[in-house]
């Protein structure tokens, strides 16, 4: 198994470490790579788009040539997980986006950028998961908000109280929060099971 973390901006090393730990817990052979160039996509079984700043990530993905190949691979069934800004990158509709911003538009959700306010308004809270009874501590940092599910294909994956904060659509997972900033690898393990 080969997992690529888009390594252009954001919390890349944390996702790499969390994915390595999840691979070990699942007792799978595998490697995790720092994706910076399109030629590195050869042989990749799954991709993670980390948090950071969505405008910067979008611009850098286009500049490095990663944008179009990743979009095509995801449309063809490649498992992808986007967290925080990564969720914005995956979303079909983005409120508060500028006209020049370009998104992958592969996940049937409408999101609102920075819906929780500035970095000082960041918080941690227990999140309920669809696949596990034990709460997960969600780290929300200038997080986007999922405001609408746009098709029946989108299934809620995580809730903060009664509000959906994580979704799954076939091969795609999108999360408002940062699972890589905890020592809990359950979400990364769940994602990796899409590959095996």
Curated annotation (Swiss-Prot):
Origin species: Pyrococcus horikoshii (strain ATCC 700860 / DSM 12428 / JCM 9974 / NBRC 100139 / OT-3)
HAMAP family: PdxT
Pathway: Cofactor biosynthesis; pyridoxal 5'-phosphate biosynthesis
Similarity remark: Belongs to the glutaminase PdxT/SNO family.
Catalytic residues identified in the record: 84, 178, 180
UniProt subunit comment: In the presence of PdxS, forms a dodecamer of heterodimers. Only shows activity in the heterodimer.
Name the UniProt record assigns to this protein: Pyridoxal 5'-phosphate synthase subunit PdxT
EC number, UniProt record: 4.3.3.6, 3.5.1.2
GO molecular function: glutaminase activity; pyridoxal 5'-phosphate synthase (glutamine hydrolysing) activity
Biological function: Catalyzes the hydrolysis of glutamine to glutamate and ammonia as part of the biosynthesis of pyridoxal 5'-phosphate. The resulting ammonia molecule is channeled to the active site of PdxS.
Gene: pdxT
Record keywords, A-Z: Glutamine amidotransferase, Hydrolase, Lyase, Pyridoxal phosphate
Xref: Pfam families: SNO
Record-linked NCBIfam families: PLP_synth_Pdx2
